[in-house]
From Swiss-Prot:
The gene is gcvH. Belongs to the GcvH family. Keywords: Lipoyl. The glycine cleavage system is composed of four proteins: P, T, L and H. Its cofactor is (R)-lipoate. InterPro entries: 2-oxoA_DH_lipoyl-BS, Biotin_lipoyl, GCV_H, GCV_H/Fam206, GCV_H_sub, Single_hybrid_motif. CDD domains: GCS_H. The glycine cleavage system catalyzes the degradation of glycine. The H protein shuttles the methylamine group of glycine from the P protein to the T protein. Pfam families: GCV_H. It comes from Citrobacter koseri (strain ATCC BAA-895 / CDC 4225-83 / SGSC4696). This is Glycine cleavage system H protein. NCBIfam families: gcvH, PRK01202.1. The modification N6-lipoyllysine is found at K65.
């Protein structure tokens, strides 16, 4: 079973969301998602300042197996991207919940977070796959 930190929220598309002290949210893909994709070779990051709606594809993770869209779990403005992934996309594999984060977003409607899964619900989703 994949590592599913309890303090995070999850989308059904295997993104995770973590609230930061400054009120922004950090987004990445789950350990389960990176295991399915395999070794990352490139991450196409969103543009800082871009406005996205929940469910929009806003980044792409390319691995040796496939390219996979990364979706915004909430609506808002992209306020930062993980530039370290340009040189080290493998951080998504080795540190999916830390150094392998993809982007940070300032949520425009925090009520959307209520529709995301908690760790227990995400684990149940994984068991059903």
């Amino acid at each position: 079973m994949s590592n599913v930190p309890v303090e995070l929220k999850y989308s059904k598309e295997h993104e995770w969301l973590r609230k930061e002290a400054d009120g922004t949210y950090t987004v990445g893909i789950t350990e389960h998602a990176q295991e399915l994709l395999g070794d990352m070779v490139f991450v196409d990051l969103p543009d800082v300042g871009a406005t996205v709606a929940a469910g929009d594809d806003c980044a792409v993770a390319e691995s040796v197996k496939a390219a996979s869209d990364i979706y915004a779990p909430v609506s808002g403005e992209i306020v930062a991207v993980n530039d370290a992934l340009s040189d080290s996309p493998e951080l998504v594999n080795s540190e999916p919940y830390a150094g392998g984060w993809i982007f940070k977003i300032k949520a425009s409607d925090e009520s959307e977070i209520d529709s995301l899964l908690d760790a227990t619900a995400y684990e149940a989703l994984l068991e059903d796959e």
